[in-house]
C-alpha cells in the first residue's frame, strides 16, 4: 500500500516541505558525485551510535566534528534511490497538511525535532552499534504521527497490488498510517531494529512517529475543530 496523494486541501503553499525535499535531493546528488561515490558522504556525515555514546571514533574515515552534529546531517542523507524516493513521497503526501496546521517556521522546527528524537531512539536501542545510520525516515515518521492525530479520517489515494494486478483506491489515513506503524513495531520486535548488523533502523521510525504524535497532541491536535493559520504565516 503506497500513498500517492491525499484528499485534504491546504490553505498555504508548503514552501518548507518543498525546501526539505529539495535539500534531501541536492545532498543525495552530492553523495553520488563525491570522489568515492556515496561512501564519502556516508563515512563523514552519517551517524554512528557507538561514537555518540562512547565518544570514540570507529570508522576509518574521520567524521565531522563534533560527533553530535551527525544527528542532524544524517537526516538529509540516503542510502539509495528507493530510500530517498519513498521518504520524499511520504513527506510530499503528508507534510503539506502539517505545515498548513503549524505554519512554516514551526513545521521546520517540528520536523527537525522529530528527526533528532528518531536518532536518539535508535541510539538508545543499539548504543554499541557501529553501523552508520542515515535517512530522513525518522523525521518523516514524525510527520506521519502528527497526521494521524489531526486527520485520521482523511482519504489517502493509495496504490495497491494483488499479485500482478495494480489499482488505486481511497483509504482512510488511520488505516494507512496504522498499517505502517504496526509494520514497524512488528519488524522491530523481531530484533532487526537495532541495526547492529545492518538493515533498517526501525526504532528510529518508531521514535520519530511517536514523537510527532505526542507533540501534536500537546499542541492541541485532538481538538475537534483545528484552527487554520492565516496563509503565509510563520
List each model region and its residues:
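A detector for small-residue-rich transmembrane helices and their helix-helix packing motifs
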Residues: 1-234
Amino acid at each position: 500500500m503506497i500513498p500517492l496523494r491525499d484528499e485534504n486541501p491546504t490553505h498555504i503553499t508548503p514552501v518548507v516541505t518543498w525546501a526539505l525535499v529539495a535539500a534531501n535531493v541536492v545532498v543525495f546528488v552530492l553523495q553520488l558525485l563525491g570522489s568515492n561515490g556515496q561512501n564519502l558522504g556516508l563515512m563523514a556525515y552519517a551517524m554512528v551510535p557507538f561514537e555518540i555514546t562512547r565518544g570514540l571514533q570507529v570508522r576509518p574515515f574521520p567524521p565531522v566534528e563534533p560527533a553530535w552534529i551527525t544527528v542532524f546531517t544524517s537526516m538529509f542523507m540516503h542510502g539509495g534511490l528507493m530510500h530517498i524516493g519513498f521518504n520524499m513521497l511520504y513527506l510530499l503526501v503528508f507534510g503539506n497538511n502539517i505545515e498548513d496546521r503549524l505554519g512554516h517556521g514551526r513545521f521546520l522546527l517540528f520536523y527537525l525535532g522529530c528527526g533528532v528524537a528518531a536518532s536518539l531512539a535508535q541510539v538508545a536501542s543499539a548504543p554499541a552499534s557501529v553501523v552508520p545510520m542515515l535517512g530522513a525516515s525518522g523525521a518523516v515518521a514524525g510527520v506521519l504521527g502528527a497526521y494521524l492525530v489531526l486527520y485520521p479520517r482523511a482519504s489517502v489515494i493509495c496504490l495497491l497490488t494483488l499479485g500482478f494486478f495494480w489499482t488505486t483506491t481511497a483509504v482512510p489515513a488511520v488505516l494507512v498510517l496504522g498499517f505502517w506503524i504496526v509494520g514497524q513495531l512488528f519488524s522491530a520486535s523481531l530484533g532487526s531494529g537495532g541495526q547492529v548488523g545492518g538493515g533498517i533502523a526501525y526504532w528510529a521510525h518508531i521514535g520519530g512517529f511517536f514523537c510527532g504524535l505526542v507533540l501534536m497532541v500537546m499542541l492541541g491536535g485532538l481538538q475537534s475543530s483545528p484552527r487554520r493559520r492565516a496563509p503565509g504565516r510563520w
